[in-house]
């Protein structure tokens, strides 16, 4: 229920009532799970976000996209929804009577730690807070997550730019590794 928790009640709560409301709406046991997950996830997520930021700022990301594009004739970019995880999501979205699960404290902690790590990174790098709030928080909870909830991550990603499509594939594995190996 991780994806459902993020694209459903977590995003809706942030959109409606702000970031702190996610934590405040949890019961005591879920608050403990949130705190544990948040503290365990913040620095591993921040490490990846720093790497992404540096890759973009240095021009390495652009070079990587150009190089990957040059390989497309031999190694075309495939769809990202071919694994069991994505197939389950397709079945869940097909159920029109589905109800959103309640906020999962652990999921919320990891998600919020990653979001706040991004906010802190962009603040540290001198971005104006209005830009950070709009492009890191509002766009996620009011645009990307609802769209992903409706159509799935593959549809959302694979209808983006080549840069976004490659980035999703490149960085997802790094997030997965860091969060699994360093957080838990």
Question: For each of these PLM feature ranges, what is it?
Answer:
Residues 1:
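Rossmann-fold NAD(P) dinucleotide-binding segment
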Residues 6-99, 106-184:
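NAD(P)-dependent Rossmann-like dehydrogenase/reductase catalytic/cofactor-binding core
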């Amino acid at each position: 229920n991780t994806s459902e928790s993020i694209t459903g009640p977590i995003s809706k709560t942030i959109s409606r009532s702000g970031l702190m409301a996610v934590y405040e709406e949890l019961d005591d046991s879920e608050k403990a799970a949130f705190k544990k997950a948040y503290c365990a996830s913040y620095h591993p997520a921040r490490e990846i976000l720093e790497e992404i930021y540096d890759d973009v700022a240095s021009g390495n990301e652009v070079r990587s996209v150009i190089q990957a594009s040059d390989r497309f004739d031999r190694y075309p970019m495939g769809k990202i929804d071919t694994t069991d995880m994505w197939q389950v999501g397709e079945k869940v979205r097909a159920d029109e009577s589905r109800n959103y699960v309640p906020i999962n404290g652990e999921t919320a902690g990891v998600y919020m730690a990653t979001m706040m790590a991004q906010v802190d990174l962009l603040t540290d790098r001198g971005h104006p807070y209005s830009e950070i709030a709009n492009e890191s928080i509002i766009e996620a909870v009011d645009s990307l997550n609802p769209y992903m909830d409706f159509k799935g991550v593959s549809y959302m990603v694979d209808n983006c730019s080549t840069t976004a499509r490659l980035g999703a594939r490149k960085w997802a594995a790094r997030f997965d590794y860091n969060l699994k190996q360093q957080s838990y």
